[in-house]
């Protein structure tokens, strides 16, 4: 096991931390001003009785949550709404693992492969291409592949909109307080938001799943040749 993977599992086995510079819901005058304002935001956990003082961070919101118990160790504006972007895919993977076997085959639709924004994260799959759920999850979690998020959503719920319903039901089940999903890949939508506290809950639940830990903890994955692509594709983990 490589050093990075060893470190990854060492970290998630004890404490899970989310410290995210989410996309702000309001735009500040300049990047410098926004960054400084974020740094100067109060840290709620510093006001707790008999609790150690935590550091200031430049993230708009932050949380440190103990992975086993869910105990909050550090909190900074943790329930504020933010746009989650690609960390949405943690929930996409969690809902997928709740509903699918890894060896199920998915035929990628035209909508799944062609509705994503030009230049966004992708592994260049095409209409009619067949991948398994497991292969799609590797591409989702290592390469943040947006067409794979769409294909998983359609495979499970018939449409991305209906899959978002499942995502929101899962969020409610986990106790999320300020989350609403409208798609599976995290591409911007005004009605697609979450908060640091909720993402900690979602990721804590995901890390309890052995398949999620295995897939998201890999350094790389080799995608086999498919019915539409004659060559293998090496997918590298872009997230650490």
Predicted regions and their residues:
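Active-site-adjacent loops and short helices of periplasmic peptidoglycan-processing enzymes
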Residues: 29-197, 201-210, 215
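Sec-dependent N-terminal signal peptides of Gram-positive bacterial secreted proteins and lipoproteins
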Residues: 2-28
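Serine/threonine-rich low-complexity intrinsically disordered regions
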Residues: 1-6, 30-33, 46, 227
């Amino acid at each position: 096991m490589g050093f990075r993977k060893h470190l990854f599992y060492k970290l998630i086995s004890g404490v899970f931390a989310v410290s995210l510079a989410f996309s702000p819901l309001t735009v500040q005058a300049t990047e410098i001003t926004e960054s400084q304002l974020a740094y100067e935001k109060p840290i709620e956990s510093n006001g707790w009785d008999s609790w150690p003082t935590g550091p200031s961070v430049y993230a708009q919101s932050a949380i440190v949550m103990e992975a086993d118990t869910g105990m909050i160790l550090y909190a900074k504006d943790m329930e504020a709404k933010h746009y989650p972007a690609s960390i949405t895919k943690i929930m996409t993977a969690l809902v997928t693992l709740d509903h699918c076997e890894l060896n199920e085959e998915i035929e990628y639709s035209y909508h799944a492969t062609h509705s994503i924004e030009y230049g966004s994260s992708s592994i260049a799959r095409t209409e009619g291409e067949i991948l398994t759920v497991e292969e799609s999850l590797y591409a989702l979690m290592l390469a943040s592949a947006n067409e794979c998020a769409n294909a998983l959503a359609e495979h499970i719920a018939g449409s991305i909109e209906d899959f978002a319903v499942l995502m929101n039901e899962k969020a409610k089940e986990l106790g999320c307080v300020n989350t609403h999903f409208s798609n599976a890949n995290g591409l911007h939508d005004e009605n697609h938001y979450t908060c640091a506290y909720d993402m900690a809950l979602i990721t804590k639940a995901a890390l309890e799943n052995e398949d999620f830990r295995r897939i998201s903890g890999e350094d790389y994955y080799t995608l086999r040749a498919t019915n539409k692509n004659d060559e293998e594709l090496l997918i590298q983990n872009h997230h650490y």
